[in-house]
UniProtKB/Swiss-Prot annotation:
The keyword Ligase does not apply. Pfam families: Pro_CA. It comes from Emericella nidulans (strain FGSC A4 / ATCC 38163 / CBS 112.46 / NRRL 194 / M139) (Aspergillus nidulans). It catalyses: hydrogencarbonate + H(+) = CO2 + H2O. Induction: Down-regulated when grown with elevated levels of potassium chloride. It comes from the Eukaryota. Zn(2+) binds at C56, D58, H112, C115. SUPFAM superfamilies: beta-carbonic anhydrase, cab. Coiled coil: none annotated. This is Carbonic anhydrase. Binds 1 zinc ion per subunit. InterPro entries: Carbonic_anhydrase (IPR001765), Carbonic_anhydrase_CS (IPR015892), Carbonic_anhydrase_sf (IPR036874). One of its GO terms (biological process) is cellular response to oxidative stress.
Amino acid sequence: MPDPSDRKAVTRYLEQTHDKIFESNRAWVASKKGADPEFFNKLAAGQSPEYLYIGCSDSRVPANEIMGLDAGEVFVHRNIANVVPTIDLSSMSVINYAVGHLKVKHIVVCGHYNCGGVQAALTPTDLGILNPWLRNIRDVYRLHEKELDAIEDDGERFNRLVELNVIESCRSVIKTAVVQQSYEENGFPIVHGWVFNLKDGLLKDLNIDFPGILADIQKIYNLTKGSS
C-alpha cells in the first residue's frame, strides 16, 4: 500500500487491486471449464449442499478451501467469531433456509485458534458497537469461568475459550425449532463443532455429543411439533 499522502499512487493501487480480481476471475473460469466444460451449467441449475458451515469472517479461514469442497457443495454463513445468537435475524434466517429448504445433512460451527473476536472479548475494555456482539463470547467465559480461570497459561486459556465458544454456538443451533423438528422427522441435520488451526491448516473435531446436548436442551427448549 502506498503512502496515503500520495493520492495518485493510492488511486493507482486501488485500481490495480480491483482489476486484479477480474483477471483472477477469468483465470478461474477458464480453469473450471477446462476441467469440466459443464461446470457452470450444473452450477446454474441449482444447489443441494450437504453442509451448512457457520464460521468466522476471518479472511484466513475460507470455508470451501479448508473443507476441500467446490462451489455449490457448502452453504456458508460467517460473522465475527462464529457466534450464533438466537435473536440474530441473519443467523436464524440462514439456519432456517439451509435446513428447511436446502435440507442440509450437517451443520458445522467452525471457529479458529488465534481468533481476533475471541481475543477482543477477553479484553476488559469498551469496544463501542462491538460490545453487544462480544457480550455473547464474554457470556461463554462467564458460564465456564471456573474451568478457564484454572488454566494458568494465557495461550491455552485463549484456545480453550475458542473451543467453548464453538460448543456454545452449537448449543444455540440445536435450540432452534427447525433443527429439532427436522432431526425428529428425518434424522438430520447433525450438528458438529470444529476448530481450524492456522498454524498447520488442520481441522479439529471437538466431537460434541449432539444427541446428548439435544436431549438436555429439550428439557427446556423442546420445540418439536409433538411437544405441545
